[in-house]
Amino acid sequence: MTKKTIYFICTGNSCRSQMAEGWAKQILAEDWNVYSAGIETHGVNPKAIEAMKEVGIDISNHTSDLIDNNIIKNSNLVVTLCSDADVNCPSLPANVKKEHWGFDNPAGKPWSEFQRVRDEIKIAIENFKSR
């Protein structure tokens, strides 16, 4: 069976989309190729790396990438993770489905916010898998 492609997008490809990519590569790897990107690149937030490390997922080798139109056009699903990405997402080919899963931006917030958002993203991906 050919794997489908899921593309997670947020503003800076720094926190939410990085954590989503990390979770999805663990939870969806059997059926999905997983990528993430941003409208801009802000570098991977060290607290996002630490939050994922806390649950045994290493995203320290991830890079902060701009949206790649080749990945978009070959995706089955594009998931925006913040309102900025939802509004500014490039137009998608008709065959690419888009969903918006809004999460708070933990950047600049207390450590507990990174943990909360990380855990909310995991739940969303588990719910997606069970659809």
Curated annotation (Swiss-Prot):
Annotated EC: 1.20.4.4
Subcellular location: Cytoplasm
Paired cysteines (S-S): 10-82, 82-89
Pfam families on file: LMWPc (PF01451)
GO MF terms held by the record: arsenate reductase (thioredoxin) activity; protein tyrosine phosphatase activity
InterPro entries: Arsenate_reductase_ArsC, Ptyr_pPase, Ptyr_pPase_sf
GO BP annotations, alphabetical order: response to arsenic-containing substance
Keywords: Arsenical resistance, Cytoplasm, Disulfide bond, Oxidoreductase, Redox-active center
Reactions this protein catalyses: arsenate + [thioredoxin]-dithiol + H(+) = arsenite + [thioredoxin]-disulfide + H2O
Record-linked SMART domains: LMWPc
Gene Ontology cellular-component terms listed: cytoplasm
Active site residues per record: 10 (nucleophile), 82 (nucleophile), 89 (nucleophile)
Domain of life of the organism encoding this protein: Bacteria
Signal peptide, first to last residue: none
Function: Catalyzes the reduction of arsenate [As(V)] to arsenite [As(III)].
Family designation: Belongs to the low molecular weight phosphotyrosine protein phosphatase family. Thioredoxin-coupled ArsC subfamily.
Database matches in NCBIfam families: arsC_pI258_fam (TIGR02691), PRK13530.1 (NF010053)
Identification of the protein by name: Arsenate reductase
Gene of this entry: arsC
